[in-house]
């Protein structure tokens, strides 16, 4: 139903950024689980076709990692084959790809096991959902991906904005977001 509402408002020149897979990959959740190289890919292709049918530009985004480190301080892949399925669909359908899976690994590893919890909600107890700092770092990754993919949308981005390297994230200590009189900055809306 949400997608139908989105489609009803979509018009030529719009962009549809497509990123999902966190819950689809959980085989213990039968209500959301789908196989990566069959049903999941088919769903992605439906999103792409519906966007194109309306003159919009689809853009695929791989899922960001969960914050799960191995013993060497490297991020572990908890999404199985889903990121690769997205990459395959991007190639098969000739769709721009933003590899947030790869960029988030660089980001989390740069922060390390000690500082990376500062990018997540519930004071780092949540290893999936980001706080405002983490969401901002990932948003910068997406902006980088828009530029690297050569999307025409990149011309709408502020030209003097500094380039972002997820291996060199903004210092968490220096991050500030103006206070809101109605909402805490510990957890972003929609999370």
Give the residues covered by each predicted segment.
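Alpha-helical cap/lid subdomain in secreted, periplasmic
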Residues: 2-159, 178, 186-191
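A short, charged, Gly/Pro-tolerant segment at domain boundaries
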Residues: 158-173
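Mixed-charge, low-complexity intrinsically disordered regions
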Residues: 173, 181-182
């Amino acid at each position: 139903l949400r997608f139908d509402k989105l489609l009803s408002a979509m018009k030529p020149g719009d962009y549809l950024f497509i990123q999902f897979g966190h819950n689809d990959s959980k085989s213990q959740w039968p209500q959301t689980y789908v196989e990566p190289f069959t049903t999941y890919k088919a769903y992605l292709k439906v999103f792409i076709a519906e966007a194109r049918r309306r003159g919009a530009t689809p853009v695929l985004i791989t899922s960001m990692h969960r914050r799960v480190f191995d013993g060497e301080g490297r991020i572990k892949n908890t999404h199985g084959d889903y990121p690769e399925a997205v990459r395959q669909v991007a190639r098969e359908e000739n769709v721009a790809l933003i590899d947030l899976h790869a960029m988030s690994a660089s980001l989390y590893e740069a922060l390390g096991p000690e500082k990376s919890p500062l990018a997540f909600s519930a004071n780092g107890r949540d290893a999936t959902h980001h706080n405002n700092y983490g969401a901002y770092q990932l948003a910068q990754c997406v902006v980088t991906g828009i530029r690297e993919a050569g999307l025409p949308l990149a011309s709408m981005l502020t030209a003097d904005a500094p380039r972002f390297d997820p291996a060199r994230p903004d210092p968490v200590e220096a991050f500030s977001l103006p206070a809101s009189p109605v909402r805490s900055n510990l957890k972003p809306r929609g999370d």
